[in-house]
């Protein structure tokens, strides 16, 4: 499949709400939460006023002019927060485009971008049963903390 990875455009920032919802891990057999769940404060931390902080950066994957995946970072007090100097990462790819290497490409490109901005580390939080754990580990992320449901992972750039 042909796709392009590029920087998000300002007029596309609202799409991050859709990708935030897509990033919520839903185990097989579990009813998805209502889309309004993204309005809770702990999830809005990922997208509220995106682009206004100097460390806000996002890339998107595009297929035939349609944005089908997004990855973004910002320094925030989220589930994956480790310190005030380390951006936290969020990402998702629409279901029908998963398993084709698009997420891996988005991740690789964003890590290069963040390194070019002088960051030495990226963090994230991921549900232990999420298939993306394998992708993060393959990319070089290491588990630095965990609770009963999630891993906190970091990668040195």
Predicted features and spans:
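Conserved acetyl-CoA-binding loop-helix of GNAT-fold acetyltransferases
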Residues: 90, 99-112, 137-138
């Amino acid at each position: 499949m042909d796709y392009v990875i590029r920087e998000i455009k300002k007029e596309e920032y609202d799409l991050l709400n859709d990708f935030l919802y897509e990033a919520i891990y839903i185990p097989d057999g579990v009813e998805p939460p209502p889309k309004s769940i993204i309005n809770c404060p702990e999830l809005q931390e990922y997208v509220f006023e995106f682009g206004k902080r100097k460390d806000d950066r996002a890339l998107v994957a595009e297929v035939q002019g349609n944005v089908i995946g997004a990855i973004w970072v910002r320094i925030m007090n989220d589930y994956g927060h480790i310190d005030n100097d380390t951006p936290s990462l969020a990402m998702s790819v629409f279901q029908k485009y998963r398993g084709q290497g698009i997420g891996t490409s988005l991740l690789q490109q964003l890590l290069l971008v963040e390194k070019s901005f002088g960051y030495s580390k990226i963090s994230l939080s991921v549900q232990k049963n999420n298939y993306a754990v394998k992708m993060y580990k393959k990319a070089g992320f290491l588990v630095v903390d965990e609770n009963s449901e999630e891993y906190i992972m970091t990668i040195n750039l």
